[in-house]
């Protein structure tokens, strides 16, 4: 595992294979080591690609960072900078769940870094978005309000980033509680469902202007976190998008997420390697040969 400082934050990453540049971003605050992520990267590398997997700021072994208009925008800017530093632009930028949002924002905010864009499990709908704001920001905001930054550093949701990068604990403690609370409120507000942002942080008008080959996998009808309507509407918004069915059944997300709390599941992303043939065929057709 290597690290690189981008935008004043140290980011952990790995590059697998050689060929056309790709970047894979998982969802939640899960790391690049979550089962299924590396396996997808390896499957793409075996098809002649150079694939970046990385820990976003606030994930895995990377540093915590509390700048930016939103957490996803901050992570998108970090991905763009990392790809540029690694001489991997333009890249095919792909991701699922929260990783799809980061991928989309990366392409929208940094047009020159994206050769193509593929997304699945795109968060949306009033319920899906409102719960995300609480999930990502609510616990930290409440802890900082009631117990200061010591209480934030003790939250289970931050245990992995402190365990894998112990210096992160001090980074939490160095935050001014009032400023941190304001950041959490700002980040939370981005998830408020509104009529002109299908995907939080990206105006629909800007999505309509994003001229990059895009592949959107249709969400399951049973998935209320990443609604089918959101995937269909995003495919309609993006001018060069193709909507396709995923290589798994309707209940993939629900099945994987239901298994996690009891420790019975293999991980949310374990099915991702099945995407490789579809992604490769689409990239060969729509993205073209790497420079």
Where are these regions (language model features)?
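Conserved acidic catalytic loop of the alpha/beta-hydrolase fold
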Residues: 74-91
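Conserved alpha/beta-hydrolase catalytic His-Asp/Glu region
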Residues: 128-131, 146-190, 197
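Flexible "cap/lid" loop of the alpha/beta hydrolase fold
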Residues: 101-104, 108-109, 113-145
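Conserved HGGG/HGGXW glycine-rich cap/lid loop of the alpha/beta-hydrolase fold
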Residues: 8-63
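Glycine-rich "HGGG/HGxG" loop immediately N-terminal to the catalytic nucleophile
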Residues: 54-72, 254-255
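Conserved alpha/beta-hydrolase "nucleophile elbow" surrounding the catalytic nucleophile
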Residues: 95-97
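Conserved serine/cysteine hydrolase catalytic core
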Residues: 186-237, 242-246
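Catalytic active-site module of serine/aspartate enzymes centered on a nucleophile-bearing elbow/loop
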Residues: 240-291
